[in-house]
């Protein structure tokens, strides 16, 4: 019994909770929903009778009480001419990746509807400003943007629609729209390109027998002080045209278009792309002035240049659409990358020459021949070495050492005749003036009364660099800048 009562209580509470939730939702919907406006043709005679007879509301009611918005003006007669003009509030930059642009505009349409002529007893101005809620009670052109990707109306703080009814039956509608329009781009000359972006206004359902769009005379598109971050747009570059289209099976549909000519500003790419890549290429040429045997300095410099240019190419490729043709910027980046890579290849050729044994021996022979011609080579050079090994010693030093050895060694009764050979067996980096005949280091004076350091080694011999390796670096210093300058002359003369 208690269990059944508990279940009944639980079911009752659930029903009460659901009913409360439903009431709360309905109240929220009622608050958020705007009050529905009924056109005069939809109102009852009692409601119309409550309106004062001499009021403007009564005049509008008299105009619209028998008005059918489903039927166009001049039905079965001449087509309705709709005069169109546009005021551009803002113009967004072109997006290269999506190939579109966004504009915020006031779209204005004006046409004549004889059914809306103001009565003769209407006193006041020649135009009657009407609340936007009445817009849905009128017939209106079925205009749409043919190249539109997305669009939206504005309703902050009220619907941004302006409606005028003139005494002669002319109707003027102005509405604020934000539209994203497609713009197919030709990026062959990017970033020195000029783009032509269209805005096409077309009738959706009425053929040219019923409706015609006409640009307003004068300046149908008003453009005031619009600055774009990457493009220049001028009022003089705006073109107007007719784009009436034929659709098989239905006929011709009226269409008008405006073409915006946008010239890209190159300053951003000059500072952000061209200048850095040019400096990287020039930086890669510094290796031509570094000693050919300094591979620890030249190789990292070349690799850094190539990697920096490759990274720049990858970054820009991610920001641009993937097109099948080569852009002007691609030509520049590829050329810079090739110049950086060529400087690295040039050092590889220098290394081949530097490590070629035949060329090294030939260079040694050339140096020896040159010294011999100057009187410093041949036998004289051989005599001034320890044991003919090539280690230089002064003649005076050799004589002093020999004299010392003779004095010391001849006083020994057990000295063998071949003990003087120790002089010839000394290490090649020993100076005889610093050692006795037994190879022991001694202190000698340097002529100023000060003892010289023991076991003083001569400076290391300079590596032999073949002339061919030096000549390659010499040619590269002139050839690379000249070729890059020639490329710049051709490049800028074509693309600028």
From Swiss-Prot:
InterPro entries: Glycine_rcpt_B (IPR008060), GlyR_beta__ECD (IPR047031), GlyR_beta_TM (IPR047029), Neur_chan_lig-bd (IPR006202), Neur_chan_lig-bd_sf (IPR036734), Neur_channel (IPR006201), Neuro-gated_channel_TM_sf (IPR036719), Neuro_actylchol_rec (IPR038050). It catalyses: chloride(in) = chloride(out). It is a multi-pass membrane protein. Pfam families: Neur_chan_LBD, Neur_chan_memb. Residues 23-268, 316-327, 496 are extracellular. GO terms for molecular function: extracellularly glycine-gated chloride channel activity; extracellularly glycine-gated ion channel activity; glycine binding; protein-containing complex binding; transmembrane signaling receptor activity; transmitter-gated monoatomic ion channel activity involved in regulation of postsynaptic membrane potential. The record marks 307 as: Important for obstruction of the ion pore in the closed conformation. Detected in spinal cord, brain and brain stem, especially in the periolivary region, spinal nuclei, trigeminal nucleus, medulla oblongata, pons and midbrain. Detected in the inner plexiform layer of the retina (at protein level). High levels of expression in cortex, hippocampus, thalamus and cerebellum. Detected in spinal cord. Glycine 2 binds at residue 250. The modification Phosphothreonine is found at residue 391. Gene3D superfamilies: Neurotransmitter-gated ion-channel ligand-binding domain (2.70.170.10), Neurotransmitter-gated ion-channel transmembrane domain (1.20.58.390). GO terms for cellular component: dendrite; endoplasmic reticulum; external side of plasma membrane; GABA-ergic synapse; glycine-gated chloride channel complex; glycinergic synapse; membrane; plasma membrane. PROSITE patterns: NEUROTR_ION_CHANNEL. Keywords: Cell membrane, Cell projection, Chloride, Chloride channel, Cytoplasm, Disease variant, Disulfide bond, Glycoprotein, Ion channel, Ion transport, Ligand-gated ion channel, Membrane, Phosphoprotein, Postsynaptic cell membrane, Receptor, Signal, Synapse, Transmembrane, Transmembrane helix, Transport. Its main location: membrane. Glycans are attached at residues 54, 242. Belongs to the ligand-gated ion channel (TC 1.A.9) family. Glycine receptor (TC 1.A.9.3) subfamily. GLRB sub-subfamily. Forms heteropentamers with glycin receptor alpha subunits. Heteropentamers with GLRA1 can be composed of two GLRA1 and three GLRB subunits, or three GLRA1 and two GLRB subunits, or four GLRA1 subunits and one GLRB subunit. Forms heteropentamers with GLRA2. Functional GLRB-GLRA2 heteropentamers contain four GLRA2 subunits and one GLRB subunit, although alternative subunit composition cannot be excluded. Forms a heteropentamer with GLRA3. Interacts with GPHN. It is linked to Defects in Glrb cause the spastic condition which is characterized by muscle rigidity, tremors, myoclonic jerks, pronounced startle reaction, abnormal gait and impaired righting ability. Neurons from the ventral horn of the spinal cord display reduced inhibitory postsynaptic currents. Likewise, hypoglossal neurons display a dramatic reduction in the frequency and amplitude of postsynaptic inhibitory currents. This is Glycine receptor subunit beta. The lineage of its organism: Eukaryota, Metazoa, Chordata, Craniata, Vertebrata. The gene is Glrb.
């Amino acid at each position: 019994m208690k269990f059944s009562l508990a279940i009944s209580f639980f079911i009752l509470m659930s029903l009460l909770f659901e009913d409360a939730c439903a009431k709360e939702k309905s109240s929220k919907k009622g608050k958020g929903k705007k009050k529905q406006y009924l056109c005069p043709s939809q109102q009852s005679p009692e409601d119309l009778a409550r309106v004062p007879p001499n009021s403007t509301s009564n005049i509008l009611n008299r105009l619209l009480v028998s008005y059918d918005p489903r039927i166009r003006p001049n039905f079965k007669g001449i087509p309705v001419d709709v005069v169109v003009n546009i005021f551009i509030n803002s113009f967004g930059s072109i997006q290269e990746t999506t190939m579109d642009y966004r504009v915020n505009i006031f779209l204005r349409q004006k046409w004549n509807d004889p059914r809306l002529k103001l009565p003769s007893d209407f006193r006041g101005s020649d135009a009657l400003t009407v609340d936007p809620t009445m817009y849905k009670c009128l017939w209106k052109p079925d205009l749409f943007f043919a190249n539109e990707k997305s669009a939206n109306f504005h309703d902050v703080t009220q619907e941004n629609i302006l409606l005028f009814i003139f005494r002669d039956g002319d109707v003027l509608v102005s509405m604020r729209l934000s539209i994203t329009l497609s713009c197919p781009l030709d990026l062959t000359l990017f970033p020195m390109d000029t783009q032509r972006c269209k805005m096409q206004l077309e009738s959706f359902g009425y053929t040219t027998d019923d409706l015609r769009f006409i640009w307003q005379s004068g300046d149908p598109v008003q453009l005031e002080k619009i600055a774009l971050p990457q493009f220049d747009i001028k009022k003089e570059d705006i073109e107007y045209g007719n784009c009436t289209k034929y659709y098989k099976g239905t006929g011709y549909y009226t269409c008008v278009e405006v073409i915006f000519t946008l010239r890209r500003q190159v300053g951003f790419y000059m500072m952000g792309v061209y200048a850095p890549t040019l400096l990287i290429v020039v930086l890669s040429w510094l290796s031509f002035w570094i000693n050919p045997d300094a591979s620890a300095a030249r190789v990292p410099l070349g690799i850094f240049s190539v990697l920096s240019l490759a990274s720049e190419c990858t970054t820009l490729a991610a920001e641009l659409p993937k097109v099948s043709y080569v852009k002007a910027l691609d030509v520049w980046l590829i050329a810079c990358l090739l110049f950086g890579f060529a400087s690295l290849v040039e050092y590889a050729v220098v290394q081949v020459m530097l490590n070629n044994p035949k060329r090294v021996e030939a260079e040694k022979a050339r140096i020896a021949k040159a010294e011999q011609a100057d009187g410093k080579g041949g036998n004289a050079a051989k005599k001034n070495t320890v044991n003919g090994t090539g280690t230089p010693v002064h003649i005076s030093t050799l004589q002093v050492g020999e004299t010392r050895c003779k004095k010391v060694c001849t006083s020994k009764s057990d000295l063998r005749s071949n003990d003087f050979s120790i002089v010839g067996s000394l290490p090649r980096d020993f100076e005889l003036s610093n050692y006795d005949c037994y190879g022991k280091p001694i202190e000698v004076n340097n002529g100023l009364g000060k003892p010289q350091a023991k076991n003083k080694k001569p400076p290391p011999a300079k590596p032999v660099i073949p002339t061919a390796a030096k000549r390659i670096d010499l040619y590269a210093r002139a050839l690379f800048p000249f070729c890059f300058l020639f490329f710049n002359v051709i490049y800028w003369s074509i693309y600028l």
